[in-house]
C-alpha cells in the first residue's frame, strides 16, 4: 500500500473481483452472518475514522489517506467456513496504519453485527447501492459435515397447514387489533371532544361572568367620573387646554426609549385627563405663552428646590426630553381619531340640552325609577302576529320575544300565534284581553231588532212555482199585462224575474222561478225569499216531477201555498184530477176539506185572474205582514249579472228597511256604494221600501244569487266584511280543488276520483243563476270515469282573458246568452280554441254530454267463434311450428283471437298468424274440417291442446 492524498482515488484490480471505487478515509471489511438451516450472508462493513478537535482549534488537513485495508477475501480463505471473521472490523477501528492479519485460530460461531461506532457511522450516498459496488460478495464455503433431515410428505403437509392456520390467526388477530384500536381511538376522541366541549362551555360561562363584572365595574367608574360638575369641568378644561405648538411633557423617571403604562392612567374609552404642560423651550422660533411654560399653580420656589437638589448631588430622575417631531395645523388632523381625542377637542363639546338629558338619565338610573305600567284592553283575534300584538299592547316586540325565549320558544316578530298564546302573553305583561272571532265582523249587520212602534204593513212577496211549461210566466204576464215570454229563449224562463203589480190599491210583489230540473237551487232561493207560494198546475197535465219538488220547497220554507189550476180552457182539462193528485202529496185544497186555497184560472184567456189576486191579498191579510221602513235596509239578492254599459247589476228584494242611493252595502263577498235604483219598469227611483224588487248599480263585483245584503255604516266596515267573506270562499275553493285531507272516506274518494278523465270547460252566461244551473247539471253528468271540470265561470261576455285561460287549461268555451268580442274571437281563432254559443240549456247539456262520451274508453265485447283440437305439430322451416287441427265446434276465422288451452288452463292468448287448408290460405274453416294454424310469436304447442277462437269488438259508450 502507498500513501495517497485525499484527492487521489485509486483503482484496485483483482481478477476475481469487479472494479470498485474506494473512498478516502473509509475502511471496508466483510463479515458473515449465519442463519438457521445453515444459511449464511456476507455483509460489508465500512468504518470511517474522525478526528475530534476543540472549538478553538482549526481542523488539520490530513496529509495522507487512511491505510488501505486488507483484501476482504483474505479472511474467509484463512478462517474456517463456519466462523465469521471480525478481525477486519477491528483493524478498521484501530489507529495503526498497517493492517494486522487475523490469527488462524477458530473464532466462536456467533453471528454478530458489524462492530461500528454509532456516532461516527457515515451515511451512504444516495446513488450507491449497499454493498453492491464496494466489494464482491464472497462465495460461501462448502458446508461439509452437515446432514439435513428430510421430512415426509405428511409432515410437510401438517407443517404447511399449521403455518397457514397460524397465518390466518395472525391476520384475524391483526384485524381484531385494528378494530379494537379504532374503537379505542373513537372512544378517546369522543371523550376528548366531550371534555373540550365541557371546558369550552365552562370557559364561556366564566368569560361571560367576567365580562359582565368588568362591564359593571366600568359602568360604575364611568358613572363616578361623569358626575355632573359643570363648574369644575369648565375650569379644568380652561386650565388644562393643551398648547397648539407645545412639546409633550415627559414624566420624571421614565427611562429613555420605553413607554410603560402609568399606574393612574385611565382605561381606553374613559375620558382622558387634561395634560399638564411642563417647562419647554420654544420650538420652531415661536415663543410659548407663559401659561404653557409651567404648570398652573407652580411657583419659582419649586424650581429653586429642584435646582438646589441637583446642586447638592441628590440623585434626581433624568429628565426626558420631548420628541422633536412637530405637527403643523394640517398634520394634527392626520392622526388616528379616537373617542377620547374626539371628546377632548373644544369644537366637539356637548350642547346644554344634551347635558341636561344626560343628567336626567343618570339621575333616573341612580334612583332606579320605573315607569308606571299602563294596563290596556287588548283585542285579540283568532290569529295575530307578534308585531301586531306588541303594537296593540304598546310594548316592544323584543320584550315579547325575550319572554317567549324564556318559555323555550324561538319566534320572530312576523310569526303568527293563536289566540290562546296571545292571551297568555298579554296577561303576563299586565293587560286585559278581549277575545274576538274573525266572524265577529258580521255581528250587528243582520237580524237587528225592529222597532215595534214603527212597524207598518208591507206588500206580500209571492213566488210562482210549478212544472215546466205549465204556464207560470204566461200567468204572470197576464197579471202584469206585459209580454215577458217573448223575451225568453224557446219560451222557457231562464232566470228569476221580480215584478210588482197593484190590485185594489194594494201592491203585490211576484217572483217568477224557472221550472225545469236544472234550476232547483233557484226555486229553493225563491221559496226562501217569499211570503206566499202560488203552485201552478196545468189542468191537462196534472202533477209532474217539478210540481212535487216545488211543493217540497214551499213546505221546507214554511210558506203557505195557493194552487192555481191553469189551462182550464183546454178540452182535456180536468181540475178535479189535479186536486186528487195533490192529495197524494199532502196538499189539501178547500174544496176537499183542506185549508189550501185553489183557483181555476186561464192565463191565455185571462180567466179568474182577479180571484187569484184576491186570494193572495186574503192570505197576506191572514199573515199580517209588517216591516219597519225607517231602519237600515236588509234583503236578499234575487239575481246578479254583469252588464256591459252599467257594470255589475244585482236584482235584490228588500225585506226590511228602506234603501237609498248613496248607501254603502255588503252583498255576499262584494261591497259597493249604491249609484242608482231601478224598478221593474226600468225607472230610476229615489228609494226602495220593504218588499220592493229593484236593480242596484254600483257594486264592486257580481254577487252570487241568494246572497243576503245589508247596509253598513262606512266603507271600512264594508271592506272588512267583504274581505273576510272572500277569504272564506277562497279557502273553501282551495280545499275543494286540492282535496283537503280529512277523514279516511274522503281520502279514499280522492283516490278513486284521481283516476277519472276530466273535460275542462270555461262557461260564461248572462246571469249568475243560469251559470249555477248549468254547473249543477254538468256535475250530474259525471261518472267514475269522466267528469266535467269547470275551470272558470262568470256572468258577462267572453273576453280575451277567458280565451287565454281556456288555452292554458286546454278547455272549451261555452257562452250562454252571451257573445265574444272581436278581440276574443280573433284570439280564439288564432290559438285554435272552440267557442260555442247556446241560448237553451237543454242543447248545451246534450252537446257536453256527447263530448264527454267521447272521453269514455270503448267497451270491449268478445264473441265466441269455435274450438279446434290439435292433432299433430309440424316444424316447418321459416314458419316455425304449425298445428294440424280439426275444428270441433263452430268455426275458425283468419285473424281472429285465439286462446291455447292445455288441461283446461289458458296458457296463451294471442292472434292467428296463418290459417291454411291444403297449403292454401283460407278465410275460415268450418266445423268438422282439418286445417293448419300458426300463432304469432308463440311456438309452445303440443298435440292434444285445444284452440279457442273468438272475435273482439270495441263498442263506444255513452253517458
UniProtKB/Swiss-Prot annotation:
GO CC terms in record: cytosol
Region annotated Disordered, chain positions: 1-374
G2: region residues: 491-495
Q: Where in the cell is it found?
A: Cytoplasm
Q: Which residues form a coiled coil?
A: none
State the residue spans of region: G4: 566-569
Keyword Cytoplasm on this protein? yes
Outline the extent of the tr-type G domain: 457-626
Quote the InterPro entries the UniProt record gives.
EF-G-like_DII (IPR053905), EFTu-like_2 (IPR004161), IF2_assoc_dom_bac (IPR013575), IF2_II (IPR044145), IF2_N (IPR006847), P-loop_NTPase (IPR027417), Small_GTP-bd (IPR005225), T_Tr_GTP-bd_dom (IPR000795)
SUPFAM superfamilies named in the record = Initiation factor IF2/eIF5b, domain 3, P-loop containing nucleoside triphosphate hydrolases, Translation proteins
Keyword check for Cytoplasm: yes
Gene3D superfamilies in UniProt: P-loop containing nucleotide triphosphate hydrolases, Translation factors, Translation initiation factor IF- 2, domain 3
Return the similarity comment: Belongs to the TRAFAC class translation factor GTPase superfamily. Classic translation factor GTPase family. IF-2 subfamily.
The UniProt function text for this chain reads: One of the essential components for the initiation of protein synthesis. Protects formylmethionyl-tRNA from spontaneous hydrolysis and promotes its binding to the 30S ribosomal subunits. Also involved in the hydrolysis of GTP during the formation of the 70S ribosomal complex.
What is this protein identified as?
Answer: Translation initiation factor IF-2
Organism, as annotated: Brucella abortus (strain 2308)
